[in-house]
Amino acid sequence: MASRWWRWRRGCSWKPAARSPGPGSPGRAGPLGPSAAAEVRAQVHRRKGLDLSQIPYINLVKHLTSACPNVCRISRFHHTTPDSKTHSGEKYTDPFKLGWRDLKGLYEDIRKELLISTSELKEMSEYYFDGKGKAFRPIIVALMARACNIHHNNSRHVQASQRAIALIAEMIHTASLVHDDVIDDASSRRGKHTVNKIWGEKKAVLAGDLILSAASIALARIGNTTVISILTQVIEDLVRGEFLQLGSKENENERFAHYLEKTFKKTASLIANSCKAVSVLGCPDPVVHEIAYQYGKNVGIAFQLIDDVLDFTSCSDQMGKPTSADLKLGLATGPVLFACQQFPEMNAMIMRRFSLPGDVDRARQYVLQSDGVQQTTYLAQQYCHEAIREISKLRPSPERDALIQLSEIVLTRDK
């Protein structure tokens, strides 16, 4: 079945999102635009003999996710996995240990960037830099830096500027979490109270701003205008993504496209552009820059899709934050949008943002009774397969294979 899936994938020119913007361009890349959707229809029509020209967006996505429903049965991989063979035949422990070699002292170095004289502001700004996070983004960035350097000139050395990108990515991500918690009025994250819960909303906004300013200073210190342009695009995307999340669409077809665009801007853009930034610093080849970007984008979208699945399938203790949180915020994520196809009565709840008493519980039950979780997981698998296809274009190395393994971990994580 797996080989059949790969034959189908190779024969399909579908790219789940638009190609990356060039240096300095506004970069309005978003997942699965109209031209890509049209190409998918044409490809599937040729291969299946079906007329898909009139299939609306969400049904097209659902058709693709159900085309090979049993693919990608990936065995679970944990950080404690013993040494194993990589795709290139070399041994390593696991991607996190491999990536962490270049990230020792990560959070200490971030705290040094936060040069603050006011003790309260310092405490707020350093609150999430306690070393207890997953450090998923810095790990990907460090591995991508080595993979690109090896591909370019067989150098296993990570430049100081590339390591700085890993720090900056984590700082931008953390600042966005602080601001998101204010907007969502969240009370817990990573198993502890949020900054806004402890210090209040006004001070939390300022703490997030301070982290962003420190990240901007660190970015300017690198001195590469192309890299600066790439990463400042991330900050714009974060803001635009939050605005997209605050809005909604009445049309079902527009609703799913809206959701995927929001997912790209709020989550995937940071990973994609951070990967691209380290590739620019380590290799002059634009083809490599595009590979790095596409890998990060596809893994980032898959990561958020699985996060949306876990909101329905994991308990609060596992997630470190309340489950069904998205429904309580009035958000219709992938599992909800797919479930709505089986239970059209959910449309009214989506439009009123689950605001009536009992809406959240009813919507959750509809999702669990439907194949919404399964279909969202299948869609995440497709994005991860695309990420693997992209990164496999680089020269074989332990770091490249670790990035392949990371894309598989994204699908099997439970928190």
Curated annotation (Swiss-Prot):
Using the record, list the residue span of the signal peptide; answer none if the entry has no such feature.
none
* Entry keywords, A to Z: Disease variant, Isoprene biosynthesis, Lipid metabolism, Magnesium, Metal-binding, Mitochondrion, Primary mitochondrial disease, Transferase, Ubiquinone biosynthesis
**What organism is listed for this UniProt entry?**
Homo sapiens
As recorded in UniProt, its EC number(s) are 2.5.1.91
Official protein name in the record: All trans-polyprenyl-diphosphate synthase PDSS1
Q: How is the cofactor bound?
A: Binds 2 Mg(2+) ions per subunit.
Quaternary structure (record): Heterotetramer composed of 2 PDSS1/DPS1 and 2 PDSS2/DLP1 subunits.
For this chain, the family text in UniProt reads: Belongs to the FPP/GGPP synthase family.
